[in-house]
Amino acid sequence: MSTLKMMLLILLLLLPMATFDSDGQAIPGGGIPSAVNSRVRGDEKSGRSLEKRCRSGKTCPRVGPDECCERSDCFCKMVPARPYWRNKCICL
């Protein structure tokens, strides 16, 4: 009986109740964009690139917003970051 109770508890915890409105209608996906994403999207719409926003003009592409390097003589290197690897600016 305890195994059955545990399975029911797990199923209830996994049920995506947060995706429903109070009247039972599903809330559309996408959510509210973060301030960073809004800023990046706004710059993309205006034709302003990340290189123009960075003082150094050097960026390292990564998941999410790209990282601006401090200087133009920096290079990108893959570094471990949980749960995956990401590019990081390395300046000598």
From Swiss-Prot:
Organism this protein belongs to: Conus marmoreus (Marble cone)
Protein name, entry field: Conotoxin Mr15.3
Primary location: secreted
Subcellular location field: Secreted
A single MF term (Gene Ontology): toxin activity
The keyword Signal belongs to this UniProt entry's keyword annotation: yes
Entry keywords, A to Z: Cleavage on pair of basic residues, Disulfide bond, Secreted, Signal, Toxin
Family that this chain belongs to: Belongs to the conotoxin N superfamily.
Lineage top rank: taxon: Eukaryota
Modified how: Contains 4 disulfide bonds.
Domain-level remarks: The cysteine framework is XV (C-C-CC-C-C-C-C).
Propeptide stretches in the record: 21-53
